[in-house]
Amino acid sequence: KLQGLSYAEIAARGGGILNSADRLHETSEEDLFEQTMRRAEEIWQKGTGCVEIKSGYGLTTEDELKILRVAQRVKAHSPLRIVTTFLGAHAVGRAYKGRQSEYVDLVINEMMPRVAAEGLADFVDVFCDEGFFTPEETDRILEAGEKYGMKGKIHADELAFSGGSRVAIAHGALSADHLE
């Protein structure tokens, strides 16, 4: 992305969200914690006082929980102020290719209740854009998040006008990123 490539070009070269999810799946929770603590210490030393840690690179229930559990551990061991965001709807996990509505149900009915039960996230975020999640799916996910006490955020309209900005407004989202 920093080299000006589109998401499609990055994916064609073997990168992107799904590639990152594969790599995260292979990383133990302890290794992820150690890596994240090193980064937290580095940014603290450079003057950062507050940081948001998002999930969204797990795309399975266990891997999304792993990311957020690590975030909570870092929060407990770092002087940084850390806020956490559940972004299970960053992309459709590989196991659900061609079954997007089932993946949305997984996010709402399995992932989100577990995230809430463990108190792992302050916010819920959705990538509402062409090729990712529709405004209707985004609406369902944000509504579910509200029921669990997670204020909504949204990534939208980066690749095309998706209508995500309207969903953000309808839900009083805390932030709406991209909107290009």
Predicted ranges, named:
Residues 150-152, 158-180:
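Active-site-adjacent C-terminal substructures of enzyme catalytic domains
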Residues 8, 14-44, 49-162:
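Metal-coordinating catalytic core of metallo-dependent amide/deamination hydrolases
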